[in-house]
Amino acid sequence: MTVSLARLERQLGYTFKDQELMVLALTHRSFAGRNNERLEFLGDAILNFVAGEALFERFPQAREGQLSRLRARLVKGETLAVLARGFGLGEYLRLGSGELKSGGFRRESILADALEALIGAIYLDAGMEAAKERVTAWLTSEIESLTLVDTNKDPKTRLQEFLQSRGCELPRYEVVDIQGEPHCRVFFVECEITLLNEKSRGQGVSRRIAEQVAAAAALIALGVENGHD
């Protein structure tokens, strides 16, 4: 074990039995050989479960849609990158030369992905309880700062935060039709996102309202909300 990895383990609050798992979790796809993408996939699933369970227990009166919105905030890339920077994770990443030169060790998405990969690695190294304990410890202050007021956001904001938490492109809104007289127009808007094969649609007496309706429809189509929250 190198001194640097031992230092990172102290920051994480976890000592790996299998050091190769830790090294793999820190290996970006730009680096030659095996990379951390599979561990990231596993860690993402564990993170969502642990965060969901913690929110379920903290907010017993919250509706499903509220819990989903809180979890999206909790596991979004920005939150994970802040945690990763707190651990000094960037200096331990194994990056290809091009990614290294372009400052990949500072990039939000790379840091967030590596942290998820470490969660997956801890799970494989010591099981679910160990992974759950570390994730809960890392997120405790963030969870405690959340309130149900955080769910009282408009659909466009909720959709944007959900997509950002998944590392997806932001939605694109387009006015496809305007009907009616100038004093009583109705705007028709389509919302396009990469996770859906079909565009969601909305209409309203202003472009802003139509976009909000389209965003709400997209959230329902994604299964994030059920239309009754």
Swiss-Prot record:
InterPro entries: dsRBD_dom (IPR014720), RNase_III (IPR011907), RNase_III_dom (IPR000999), RNase_III_sf (IPR036389). Residues 154-224 form the DRBM domain. Mg(2+) binds at residues 40, 113, 116. GO terms for molecular function: double-stranded RNA binding; metal ion binding; ribonuclease III activity; rRNA binding. GO terms for biological process: mRNA processing; regulation of gene expression; rRNA processing; tRNA processing. Keywords: Cytoplasm, Endonuclease, Hydrolase, Magnesium, Metal-binding, mRNA processing, Nuclease, RNA-binding, rRNA processing, rRNA-binding, tRNA processing. Transmembrane segments: none annotated. It is found in: Cytoplasm. Its main location: cytoplasm. The active site is at residues 44, 116. It catalyses: Endonucleolytic cleavage to 5'-phosphomonoester. Homodimer. Belongs to the ribonuclease III family. Digests double-stranded RNA. Involved in the processing of primary rRNA transcript to yield the immediate precursors to the large and small rRNAs (23S and 16S). Processes some mRNAs, and tRNAs when they are encoded in the rRNA operon. Processes pre-crRNA and tracrRNA of type II CRISPR loci if present in the organism. This is Ribonuclease 3. The lineage of its organism: Bacteria, Pseudomonadati, Pseudomonadota, Gammaproteobacteria, Pseudomonadales. The gene is rnc.
